Amino acid sequence: ESHPTRYRLSHTNEIWVRNGVRVNAGSKHQKNGGDIFFQCLKLCCISPSSSLVDRTVFGEFGLFDEMLPACEDYDFWLRFCAFEEVHFLNEPLLIKNGGHDQQLSKKHWGMDRFRIIALEKLLQDPRLDNFKRQETIKELILRLQILIDGGRKRKKNAFVKKLAKKKAMLEAMFCNEKEPVQCE
């Protein structure tokens, strides 16, 4: 007799409302289940409000990082999804309201600053396999470039210099290995 897979994290679909008007989520925001790590690298693809998490997960992976002013959910899902699959119930059981001033994405500039911290934290985990590590590094390099471009546009020279140095170090370390990260 076969037993169904026991997932420790489950999430549902959601209805999006922006400024009081229902909107369709873009294709990149489509929810999924299974091994969604690579989708999680690109964006926060699980809404904490639509998820059920077995409490043992927090003992193993830690809590949401309250030191991050934003993107603490991105950080948590990365740490979890790097090692476990998730269940997805394709029913819109949540109404997600956006477009208001309380949204963290409107409150903080350069949200990629916090995603970079999450990616760097994930790279510290020795359990991360080589392929996922390389993909994480590629995403980190991409996020650094986004912030560099934004810093140049806003003439934040010291900020740009610091990030460019970090990006160059990553590219030098990982673009010259036997199995190099594709650096663009």
Specify the residue positions occupied by each region the protein language model found.
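Conserved nucleotide-sugar donor-binding catalytic segment
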Residues: A25-A118
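Generic alpha-helical hydrophobic packing signal
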Residues: V17, R22-V23, V57, N97, ...
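Hydrophobic residues in alpha-helical segments
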Residues: H3-P4, C40, L123, R152
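C-terminal subregions of glycosyltransferases and related glycan-biosynthesis enzymes
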Residues: G98-E184
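Generic short beta-strand
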Residues: T12-E14, S50, I148
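Conserved donor NDP-sugar-binding/catalytic core segment of glycosyltransferases
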Residues: E1-N24
